[in-house]
Amino acid sequence: MTRKLALIAAVVVAVALALWWLTVPATVPAAALPAYTPNLDNGRAMFNAGGCASCHATPNDDPDKVDRTKLGGGLALKSPFGTFYVPNISSDANDGIGGWSEADFVTALWKGTAARRGRHLYPAFPYTSYQHIQLADVRDLFAYLKTLPPVPGRVRRHDLGFPFNIRRLLGLWKLLFLHGGPYVPDPAQSAQWNRGAYLVNGPGHCAECHSPRNMLGAIIDSQRFAGGPAADGKGWVPNITPTGLQHWGDDNTAWTEKDIASYLSDGMNPAGDYAGAAMAEVIRNTALLNADDRAAIAAYVASLPPRQGPKPPAKRTDK
């Protein structure tokens, strides 16, 4: 009996050590980054493409009065797992990322790891998409962020229940769902299509909202871009594959590629309605992109394969 217990204990310890090793937060070493001169204009473009200000700008009750250069964080993101509070990513050395190295920043976007603290970041920060951003663009973005003003003040901790408050478990989540690397252009497609695919799947992280998720909070790949319930449980994010865009709204309006590009500029859809809720904030960002990038996004989105996503709840009819 004693030998059996000892064997069981040894197995438990071995499994625990294996899991501990498998869930070590991954990092990008500084030695992996060759000498580079950042392009601040491109960094600003990546800032807008990624919608950084939409989440990280210090909140204001009036969205029109938000200073998009002050990235003090604090926005509450409600989810089935609890409430996440968006961190300060201003250039403040103590409360923001002013003390980060370039390798720290690349590590956060590619690996979902807070390198200086040696711990996993929650995927409420969409590193499953940001891992596809090319290195030069990550470095340009970091350089641009450092030009923005420091904002003192540390954001409160996430409000998560057990077991979601155990960050180390995210290492197992990453083993399942964090795969891939920087975007590699498809030689069979045009330069415009590849640019759109890159912006949509990388910095734009469009699938993070426009896709349903499984019980572990990961995107269901077979229904990518097919819409689903909003992360906070309020409202519905539409299907942006042809299944949704060719039968839009109550009158089954069909979107053209030109309609998509125009919508990303002014927020008005083919039915004459304007973007609201979270999408209005997205339009604030896409409107700042150049026309070629908006056209590239439109070309890629228009090429998506039709996919049937979960069905939205029936609209209430007041009697």
Regions found by a protein language model. Give the residues of each.
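Electron-transfer interface patches adjacent to heme c in soluble/periplasmic c-type cytochromes
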Residues: K70-D104, T128-A136, Q223-N269, E281-A295
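The canonical Cys-X-X-Cys-His
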Residues: G43, A49-P59, F105, L141, ...
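Electrostatic cytochrome c docking/interface patches
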Residues: A26-N48, D62, L172-N201, K319
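N-terminal Sec-pathway targeting helices
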Residues: M1-A14
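Membrane-interface motif at the C-terminal end of an N-terminal transmembrane signal
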Residues: V15-A30
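C-terminal capping alpha-helices of c-type cytochrome domains
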Residues: L17-W21, S101-A115, S129-V155, W255-P270, ...
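Surface-exposed interaction/gating patches
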Residues: I166-A254, K258
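Extended, well-folded interaction surfaces typified by the phenylalanyl-tRNA synthetase beta subunit core
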Residues: G153-R168
